[in-house]
Amino acid sequence: VTADPPEVRMNTELLSDQVHRHLRGSIVRGELAPGQRLVESEIARRLGVSQAPVRDAVKRLVHEGLAVYQARRGNYVAEISEEEAAAARRVRAVLEAEAARQALESWSSSAHQLLAADVGAMRAAAAADDAFALREADLAFHRHVVEAGGNAYLLRAWTVLESSFYLLGVIGDPFHLGDLGRTAQWHEDLLELLDAGDVEKAVSEFGRHSASTPAELDR
């Protein structure tokens, strides 16, 4: 019996990294839904690879919080309740408001350039209708705001919670990605507030942005 050809062709280098990126992108785009089982043999067949890199990739997803392992049942795309999402947004709002405040204490042209590059990446992703690339650039933007303040403890807190924030953005509101171009514009507006040096307004807007879902920001 001739095996069916793989549906997706993968390069031969760093297969586990490629499989991880493919699966992560599938979760972001909603192709793998919250609660859906991740069957390693089926994923390996579709991608035309052995199960070993798939197993490694799925373990990384579990570590990141994008998947969960259930004993004797297997691995599943993570689900997040409305209550969990709301709690995470409250924590993120506090952290990001303080990050904006501290970033403005030592704002520099290099910080601006880094965030402007993130906004540019978001605009390019929006033009290509690439939700995965936009999510990655979005998260990088906020991480760079935290880094701009130079507070190692704040950065450590962000690093610990970053995968949860990614999970929130991807799974907390899976059916509303919003207008990708508008998402890029929101971040350009946030960057303009930092450039203007208006501490209270920047703190307020970063907090509001982080506390809201894409659907709420779209209203």
Report each predicted region and the residues it spans:
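C-terminal all-alpha effector/ligand-binding and dimerization domain
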Residues: N11, A116-R123, A128, S163, ...
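Amphipathic alpha-helical repeat elements characteristic of tetratricopeptide repeat
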Residues: D17, A93, S109, Q113-A116, ...
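Mobile beta-alpha loop/short-helix "lid" or hinge segments that flank ligand
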Residues: V62-V68, T159-S164, G178-G181
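Residue-level recognition of alpha-helical structural elements
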Residues: E84, S108-A111, D130-L134, G150, ...
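Hydrophobic packing residues in well-ordered alpha-helices of helical domains and bundles
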Residues: A88, L115, L134, D138, ...
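Hydrophobic, amphipathic alpha-helical faces that serve as interaction scaffolds
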Residues: V91-W107, L139-L177
